[in-house]
């Protein structure tokens, strides 16, 4: 085991503070509408240019182990805020820096760190409660666009496209962000339920120009097993042929003789048919088949519930207005399911989302929910260069998280104003002793730091602006983009309450831990001596004796 170096008390905290300040100073340059860019070096290719706080934080690693610990702890603040609300990373970093700097001054003056932390925690709880009261619901498209614009560093086109996507797919819909191929941002919306399975044979294609199979007003046969024997399917195929409607088969797999027979029947025009594999695997496949059944008003043919393929009738089949199948995807449009059943299924999935602890499961459940309740929108980010594309995509993702958070918990006035207004919650707040009161006062000062930083980045005088904002009330604040004072909500400067709350909670949590640090342990880095050169191989022997 390598030898360790241990630092105690003040010398440990000083080292940690250096790391905190290095990381926070780099990150806070990006805050606000006039935030600056940070250039990140890459081991290969062009450097990345970003105004995204968490991207900057992730890149920073310091040489000194003790300073690096401080930097990594602040990085954790940014990550926690990002995990909770998907945005607010820079705000969280600025708050954490202010709490740690103020807190360590108090500790150096001889205060009890544990009581300081208790004071900070008390004040945080009160401010969070006040933020929830200040929040107003974010319902209309205009407010959603404004939130997206602010989060995307004042890029209106991004705010607009996100609001449009949310309007089209609803609050439950899935919105994904991809790299586009043009210069402009594009939005494409998939109506109905789409899953990532294409046709099992290209012979099912009936639209050669688009290489797609389109079925109008089809019946859907949903089977939870492999189909390899055509005899099992004959009764249901005959019934479908008599009904004169196309058929889509969704099964675990269709292979061999069964697939060949379907292809031949389709090509001869005896029965218009297409087959695809069921989406997902294992239990998730069963659940998704059930989703399709509920959406189309059909029944999954499964031996688990005592249904066999031989006994399937037209009553077991689902109905849809149209189905489009290409090489990669199948889209079911306007399923004929009963609305009450669909709503019950949506409620059931929502309950599962609340109960699951796995992020992966939550994401998959969210997708299933969107396919049943809303739709799927894809935002394709356009840019002139690869570097700009990456930077823009990160901002679009941030803005998307921010708008979701706004819909969830409402909005508060932006530009650091909400935190200043929430200070009234701790005006009369008293701790159990004087040191807790110092902790409360410390947070009171720290909470102003985001507003100060936004103003400083815009090139104005922070103290003057903070004083003027404090004299106002309600939504009154400072628009750093234009240098005008006024109603922040009317000027369209909004922050999601969840983002502001998560940023403060993450900063107070880790800031409190740093203040109460008494010792730090790190591995001693030994300078390895340079390797010597290769030994001389000596001259080659003479070649005497040759004529």
Swiss-Prot record:
Protein name: Chaperonin GroEL
Family annotation (CDD domains): GroEL
Any one annotated GO CC term: GroEL-GroES complex
Record InterPro entries: Chaperonin_Cpn60_CS, Cpn60/GroEL, Cpn60/GroEL/TCP-1, GroEL-like_apical_dom_sf, GROEL-like_equatorial_sf, TCP-1-like_intermed_sf
UniProt KW DNA repair keyword: no
Organism: Pseudomonas aeruginosa (strain ATCC 15692 / DSM 22644 / CIP 104116 / JCM 14847 / LMG 12228 / 1C / PRS 101 / PAO1)
Subunit structure: Forms a cylinder of 14 subunits composed of two heptameric rings stacked back-to-back. Interacts with the co-chaperonin GroES.
GO BP terms in the entry: chaperone cofactor-dependent protein refolding; protein refolding; response to heat
Gene3D superfamilies: GroEL, GroEL-like equatorial domain, TCP-1-like chaperonin intermediate domain
Lineage: Bacteria, Pseudomonadati, Pseudomonadota, Gammaproteobacteria, Pseudomonadales
């Amino acid at each position: 085991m390598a030898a360790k170096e241990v630092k105690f008390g003040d010398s440990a905290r000083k080292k940690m503070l250096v790391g905190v300040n290095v990381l926070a100073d780099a990150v806070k340059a990006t805050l606000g509408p006039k935030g600056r860019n940070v250039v990140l070096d890459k081991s290969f290719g062009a450097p990345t240019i970003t105004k995204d706080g968490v991207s900057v934080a992730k890149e920073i690693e310091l040489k000194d182990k003790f300073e690096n610990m401080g930097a990594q702890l602040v990085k954790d603040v940014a990550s926690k805020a990002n995990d909770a609300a998907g945005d607010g990373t820079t705000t969280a970093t600025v708050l954490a820096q202010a709490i740690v700097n103020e807190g360590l001054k108090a500790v150096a003056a001889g205060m009890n760190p544990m009581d300081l932390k208790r004071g900070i925690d008390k004040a945080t709880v009160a401010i969070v409660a006040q933020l929830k009261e200040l929040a107003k619901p974010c319902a209309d498209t205009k407010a959603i666009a404004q939130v997206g614009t602010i989060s995307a560093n004042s890029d209106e086109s991004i705010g607009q496209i996100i609001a449009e996507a949310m309007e089209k797919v609803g609050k439950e819909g899935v919105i994904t962000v991809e790299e586009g191929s043009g210069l402009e941002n594009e939005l494409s919306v998939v109506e109905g339920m789409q899953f990532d399975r294409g046709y099992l044979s290209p012979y099912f294609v009936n639209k050669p120009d688009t290489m797609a199979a389109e079925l109008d007003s089809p019946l859907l046969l949903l089977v939870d097993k492999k189909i390899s024997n055509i005899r099992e399917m004959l009764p249901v195929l005959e019934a479908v042929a008599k009904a004169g409607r196309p058929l889509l088969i969704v099964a675990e797999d269709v292979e061999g003789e069964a697939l060949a027979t379907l292809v031949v029947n389709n090509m001869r025009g005896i029965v218009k048919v297409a087959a695809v594999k069921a989406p997902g695997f294992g239990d998730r496949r069963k659940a998704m088949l059930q989703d399709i059944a509920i959406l189309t008003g059909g029944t999954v043919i499964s031996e688990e519930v005592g249904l066999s393929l031989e006994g399937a009738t037209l009553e077991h089949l689902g109905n849809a207005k149209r189905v489009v199948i290409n090489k990669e995807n199948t889209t079911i449009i306007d399923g004929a399911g009963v609305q009450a059943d669909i709503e019950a299924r949506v409620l059931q999935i929502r309950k599962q989302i609340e109960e699951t602890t796995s992020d992966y499961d939550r994401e998959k459940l969210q997708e299933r929910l969107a396919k049943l309740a809303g739709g799927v929108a894809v935002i394709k980010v356009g840019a002139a260069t690869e570097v700009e594309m990456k930077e823009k995509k990160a901002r679009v993702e941030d803005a998307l998280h921010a708008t979701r958070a706004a819909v969830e918990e409402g909005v508060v006035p932006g530009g650091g104003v909400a935190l200043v207004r929430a200070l009234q919650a701790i005006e009369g707040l008293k701790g159990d002793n004087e040191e807790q009161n110092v902790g409360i006062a410390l947070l009171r000062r720290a909470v102003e730091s985001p507003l100060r930083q936004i103003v400083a980045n815009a090139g104005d005088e922070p103290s003057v602006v903070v004083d003027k904002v404090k004299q106002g009330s309600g939504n009154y604040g400072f628009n750093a983009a234009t240098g005008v004072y006024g109603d922040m909500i009317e000027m369209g400067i909004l922050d999601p309450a969840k983002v502001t709350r998560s940023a403060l909670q993450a900063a107070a949590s880790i800031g409190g831990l740093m203040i109460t640090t008494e010792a730090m342990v790190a591995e001693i880095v030994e300078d390895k001596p340079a390797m010597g050169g290769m030994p001389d191989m000596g001259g080659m022997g003479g070649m005497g004796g040759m004529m």
